[in-house]
Swiss-Prot record:
Pfam family, one: RNase_HII
Enzyme class: hydrolase
Record bears the keyword Manganese: yes
CDD domains reported for this sequence: RNase_HII_bacteria_HII_like (cd07182)
Source superkingdom: Bacteria
Protein name: Ribonuclease HII
Any one GO MF annotation of this record: RNA binding
Gene from which the chain derives: rnhB
Catalytic reaction list: Endonucleolytic cleavage to 5'-phosphomonoester
Function: Endonuclease that specifically degrades the RNA of RNA-DNA hybrids.
Cofactor note: Manganese or magnesium. Binds 1 divalent metal ion per monomer in the absence of substrate. May bind a second metal ion after substrate binding.
GO CC annotation terms, alphabetical: cytoplasm; ribonuclease H2 complex
Amino acid sequence: MIEFVYPHTHLVAGVDEVGRGPLVGAVVTAAVILDPARPIAGLNDSKKLSEKRRLALCEEIKEKALSWSLGRAEPYEIDELNILHATMLAMQRAVAGLHIAPEYVLIDGNRCPKLPMPSMAVVKGDSRVPEISAASILAKVTRDAEMAALDIVFPQYGFAQHKGYPTAFHLEKLAEYGATEHHRRSFGPVKRALGLAS
C-alpha cells in the first residue's frame, strides 16, 4: 500500500461504499475502527481480492475490529435524493452505528458527508488506508450477499453474476421483463425499460 500519514488521533474510522453504479438494490456502506493490537494481514481494496479471500477477511474484521457498522440507502432513497446524496446518507448511518465514537473519520473518495467529528476524504483510500480497506470489504461482502439473495427471487435477471451493474445481459433482461421493485427508477436504463424516459 502507498504510505498514508494518519491524523494524530487514536480512534480512526475508515468508511467506504459499494453499489453506486448498479441499477438495482441499495448502496451499502461500512465504517470500521481497527484495533492496533490485533492487526489483520492482507487488507486491500475489496475489488482486488478474490471472493474467497474477501469472505475470510470479512469474518476476521468483524472479530478483531474495535467497532464496525453497516449503513445503507435503499433504492427509493436513491431515487428521491440522487445517488451522491444517498451515498452520503448511507455513510452517515454507518458512522452513527459505531458503538465507539471515532475521533476522526477517513472516507474513500473525494467527498465527505457531514459528520459530528473531523473527517477527510482520501482518494484511492481503499488501497492506501487499512481502515478504509476493511470497510470496503465489509460493504462488498454484504452487498454481494444481498444480490445473491435477490437472484433467488428473480433468477431471470442474473443478479448474482453482475451484482446489478448495467451489463449487456442485465440490460437485455430489463428490456425483456421490465423492472423489479428493487430497481432504481431514477437511473436511465430503468427509466427507459419502464417507458419513463423522455
